[in-house]
């Protein structure tokens, strides 16, 4: 009997020892083969602009291709709403943020909130003045402004009288496009007036109506985006004047207007490509890869044929 008990005890000890040698559950290799599905939060300045609708489309297509989920919020050109939207995305636990700032200064608080919890930030089309941003994905806005001024000078000659319709005050795109434009215009053109129309078509129309009354001798208009350019063109057509108008973006309405020989030209961006590049950058960052501080998408001058 004692011998039987001894055998049983020996077997029990053997089994306990074998069990203790098995690695813990977290250390076992996974056989599921599943990869983490990353969620990115996208904050757009406004989806009332065809440019940003195309940009969103590029992000959604690339995210789907990479197995990523996208949560989209529309700031409706309200910087306070955008800050709140981004804070909400952080609370929802997104893995990365893609932000198209309404105002480059105002968005800084939200960027810093993301930094505090380790959520990487990629800005699109416009930069953030403060906070850590992994990369800015945008066209070369300064170069685009220079292209617009050179086009006007080439068409109308030195000293042509030009009006400038500026974008949202505080937006980096407004500042950079204006800076590039004046790099050339201050030497070759006469900028007789400039005023903000907030990247908005209706405001572009209203502002242009007022500018035409105060400056009836305007020969050309450079608008910081196509929406303002198309609004300005409507005001010009109503006045019966023949004025060269160039926009910036290359959206569908602008390209159609150029084809119809109404809008003179646009500095065309590639919003879908910008969205694609931004999503690629976010995915690379989430997988521990390094990205460039600035990722540029090429520009093209679209003119009447």
From Swiss-Prot:
Q: Tell where it localizes.
A: Cell membrane; Membrane raft
Q: How does it sit in the membrane?
A: Lipid-anchor
Indicate whether Manganese appears among the record's keywords: no
Q: Please provide, alphabetically and separated by semicolons, the GO molecular function terms listed in this UniProt record.
A: monosaccharide binding
Q: Which UniProt keywords apply?
A: Cell membrane, Lipoprotein, Membrane, Palmitate, Signal, Sugar transport, Transport
Provide the disulphide bond pattern. none
Lipidation sites (S-diacylglycerol cysteine): 19
Give GO BP annotations, semicolon-separated. Answer: transmembrane transport
Signal peptide positions on this chain: 1-18
Q: Where is the lipid attached (N-palmitoyl cysteine)?
A: 19
Q: Which GO terms describe its cellular component?
A: membrane raft; outer membrane-bounded periplasmic space; plasma membrane
The UniProt entry's sequence similarity note says: Belongs to the bacterial solute-binding protein 2 family.
Functional summary from the UniProt entry = Part of the ABC transporter complex RbsABC involved in ribose import. Binds ribose.
Q: How does it assemble?
A: The complex is composed of an ATP-binding protein (RbsA), two transmembrane proteins (RbsC) and a solute-binding protein (RbsB). Interacts with FloT.
Protein name as catalogued: Ribose import binding protein RbsB
Q: Which organism is it from?
A: Bacillus subtilis (strain 168)
